[in-house]
Curated annotation (Swiss-Prot):
Complex and partners: Interacts with PRMT5; the interaction is direct. Interacts with WDR77.
One annotated Gene Ontology cellular component of this protein: cytoplasm
UniProt-recorded name of the protein: Protein FAM47E
Keywords tagged on the record: Chromatin regulator, Chromosome, Coiled coil, Cytoplasm, Nucleus
Length: 393
């Protein structure tokens, strides 16, 4: 035990002489050990030149394909300090002609451009559906619409129309001298057009002003006599039926807003009009608004207690209750009538006649359905031939 304790005591080891191999497993040396492979040496690796796999601007040039050794090492570099971030490179802006990140060859890009050009010529212009767009829109709004939808100015007529009208509006117009004693006919109407949250107003000339441009305006003479006659007043209320109908927009009107001339053409008098409108209002009050989400509730029944439950049938309560035996008999009669009608149609056909002649020529037994068919037909003919006896009164 004492010897064992001495061995386990900590002590200093003597230095090992040079050239002496240590028997410990941790320091064993292998004479035929594996050498470091040269393929993993970063200085001997060879890489292709940068930019050979970039096909964004087309195929790379065939010249200068010499490979070169990378400047940086293959193995990771260990920094004793925090590594500095590399400066960000500016993204190279490609030309408009070259598609961004496109993998197409120049021939494919040319074909794609040709197809887009053909489709652009074939597709109709967005303003081609609106024929009366010039008359319906004010000039300022029409010019803004054209700038958005037709930037290339393909619609030359509409652009010329806008420019001509703008020039006419800018030119000074001749104002008529208005006398203080002339009749005032009211301000001009304003038509509002909503566009992108803004209201644009276009002042349209009044119909009465257009009438006075052609003829003299009524006024007072020096004697105090006015030119306003009965004919002049009737002309003001005259309706022009030769105006262009606007098919683009549908103007809905209520029954109260219908003009008197249309009511007279229909033939409604004043009393009939009041009764008609009163009936409409009363009917609307009686009609309750139906909720489409709630289905209509219908009461159903399946039969009576005194009938056989096997013969019950689902039906509504308001429908009359029919005896199932009677309904069964009626169905049988209807079925027999349909069969008779079909037999009559088949008996007149050429196929059935030829089939009957074939059976008789061969001496076969005629089937029962053919016999019944022709028996019924002969009975019908006999009934039609027999004269009806008239009883003398």
């Amino acid at each position: 035990m004492a010897d064992r304790r001495r061995r386990l005591r900590p002590g200093t080891l003597a230095p090992v002489r040079e050239g002496v191999n240590c028997r410990s497993r941790c320091f064993t040396k292998h004479k035929n050990g594996l050498k470091f492979p040269t393929s993993l040496h970063s200085r001997q690796l060879v890489f292709p030149r940068k930019g050979l796999d970039d096909f964004r601007k087309g195929c790379p040039p065939c010249t200068g394909l010499v490979t070169q050794v990378p400047v940086e090492g293959f193995l990771p570099q260990i920094y004793h300090r925090a590594p500095q971030l590399a400066p960000k490179k500016r993204q190279i802006k490609l030309l408009k002609e070259a598609d961004v990140l496109s993998k197409l060859s120049p021939a494919q890009q040319a074909r794609k451009a040709f197809l887009e050009d053909v489709e652009a010529h074939l597709t109709p212009h967005p303003l081609a559906l609106y024929l009366n767009l010039e008359e319906a829109m004010p000039i300022e709004l029409l010019s803004k619409v054209l700038e958005v939808l037709d930037p290339d100015r393909k619609l030359e007529d509409t652009w010329a129309y806008c420019q001509d009208t703008r020039k006419g509006m800018k030119e000074p117009t001749k104002l008529l001298k208005k006398h203080s004693t002339q009749v005032y006919l009211g301000p001009s109407k304003k038509t509002s057009v909503s566009n992108a949250g803004q209201w644009l107003y276009e002042e349209k000339p009044h119909k009465m002003d257009l009438l006075h441009e052609n003829g003299p305006r009524p006024g007072l003479h020096e004697n105090g006599i006015s030119d306003i006659d009965e004919e002049f007043i009737l002309k003001q209320f005259d309706i022009d039926y030769e105006t262009k109908p606007s098919h683009d927009a549908l103007h809905t009107m209520k029954l109260n807003q219908v003009p008197l001339e249309l009511k007279r053409s229909v033939g409604l008098s004043k009393l009939q009009e009041t009764e008609f409108f009163q009936k409409l209002g009363y009917e609307r009050k009686l009609q309750k608004p139906q909720n489409p989400y709630k289905p209509k509730w219908v009461k159903m029944r399946y039969g009576a207690w005194y009938l056989n439950p096997k013969l019950w049938k689902k039906q509504r309560v308001d429908e009359p209750l029919v005896d199932p035996e009677v309904s069964h008999k009626a169905q049988e009669e209807n079925f027999k009538k349909e069969l008779q009608e079909q037999e009559e149609l088949l008996a007149d056909l050429h196929g059935t006649v030829a089939f009957k002649d074939f059976i008789l020529s061969r001496g076969y037994r005629t089937p029962r359905f053919l016999e019944n068919m022709y028996i019924g037909k002969e009975c019908k003919r006999a009934c039609n031939k027999t004269p009806i006896k008239r009883t003398q009164a």
